[in-house]
């Protein structure tokens, strides 16, 4: 929990280049986590913005030519300045443009965290996926039958890229190739409003700003899962969204410790 308290105390500046569908919620969730968001995306300013930030998040949702250019500039700036960064592989399982771009970004920018659902992780690893648009395909969902092989794939991808790999879903798997965490927190309603994955990436960017990449990523995923559980007993999805942000802001360390469901593998 030291990472969480450090973020709240230091209020690090987080540069997050994301999509217009979720940008407002992403900025608010970063604020709720205790950090300060800046969502700059113009190619002529992003290097300057990234260079004064404590971490960078890039998100492939609703991709455009300008954002592709900007994310690459920011990613290289972050790498050159040893600023932690996370890439969210939104849609790489259904778009060759995004897949090719993500591979280029990973090769040239060396993100500290590669995050996506299992369809997206399989696609970036080079395995055919059954992605349903930006959502995970039914055949790619982690089950008892494919659990071990998926963990091995995630570990190999981590070792090949040098990045922490975070595969999110009903069960979340986070690995740096040596240490692997399995997280079972969360609820179905997290998949019923748009942008929760993008919001999670904002929290990951906030928590890895300390330089503690594996633990920061795992803590962000735990936090989102638990706050989803706490928020689901509401009238509907609109109320859920607001309750989720409120819980990210107000949850105590004691509740996190009480409700966390995490195992090492």
UniProtKB/Swiss-Prot annotation:
Coiled coil feature spans: none
Disulfide bonds: none
Species annotation: Clostridium botulinum (strain Okra / Type B1)
Residues holding substrate: 39, 195
Cofactor(s) of this protein: Mg(2+)
Keyword line: ATP-binding, Kinase, Magnesium, Metal-binding, Nucleotide-binding, Thiamine biosynthesis, Transferase
Family as reported in the entry's similarity comment: Belongs to the Thz kinase family.
Record's catalysed reaction(s): 5-(2-hydroxyethyl)-4-methylthiazole + ATP = 4-methyl-5-(2-phosphooxyethyl)-thiazole + ADP + H(+)
Gene encoding the protein: thiM2
Function, in words: Catalyzes the phosphorylation of the hydroxyl group of 4-methyl-5-beta-hydroxyethylthiazole (THZ).
Biological-process GO terms, alphabetical: thiamine biosynthetic process; thiamine diphosphate biosynthetic process
Top-level division of the source organism's lineage: Bacteria
Residues annotated as binding ATP: 115, 168
Enzyme Commission identifier(s): 2.7.1.50
A family per Pfam: HK
Protein name in the entry: Hydroxyethylthiazole kinase 2
EC supergroup of this enzyme: transferase
Entry-linked InterPro entries: Hyethyz_kinase (IPR000417), Ribokinase-like (IPR029056)
GO molecular function annotation: ATP binding; hydroxyethylthiazole kinase activity; magnesium ion binding
């Amino acid at each position: 929990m030291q990472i969480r308290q450090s973020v709240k105390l230091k209020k690090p500046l987080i540069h997050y280049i994301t999509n217009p569908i979720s940008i407002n919620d992403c900025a608010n969730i970063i604020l709720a986590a205790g950090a300060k968001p800046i969502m700059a995306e113009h190619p002529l300013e992003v290097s300057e913005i990234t260079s004064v930030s404590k971490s960078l998040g890039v998100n492939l949702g609703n991709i455009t030519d300008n954002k592709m250019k900007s994310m690459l500039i920011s990613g290289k700036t972050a790498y050159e300045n040893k600023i932690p960064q996370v890439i969210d592989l939104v849609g790489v399982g259904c778009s060759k443009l995004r897949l090719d771009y993500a591979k280029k970004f990973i090769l040239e920018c060396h993100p500290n965290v590669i995050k996506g659902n299992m369809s997206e992780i399989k696609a970036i690893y080079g395995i055919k996926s059954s992605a349903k648009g930006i959502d995970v395909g039914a055949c790619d969902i982690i089950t008892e039958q494919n659990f071990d092989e998926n963990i091995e794939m995630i570990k190999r991808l981590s070792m090949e890229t040098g990045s922490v790999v975070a595969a999110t879903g009903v069960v979340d798997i986070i690995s740096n190739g040596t240490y692997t965490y399995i997280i079972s927190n969360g609820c179905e309603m997290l998949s019923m409003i748009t942008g929760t994955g993008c919001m999670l990436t904002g929290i990951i960017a906030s928590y890895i700003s300390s330089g503690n990449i594996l633990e920061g990523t795992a803590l962000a995923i735990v936090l989102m899962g638990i706050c989803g559980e706490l928020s689901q007993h509401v009238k509907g999805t609109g109320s859920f969204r607001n309750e989720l942000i409120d819980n990210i802001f107000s949850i105590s360390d004691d509740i996190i410790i009480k409700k966390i469901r995490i195992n090492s593998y």
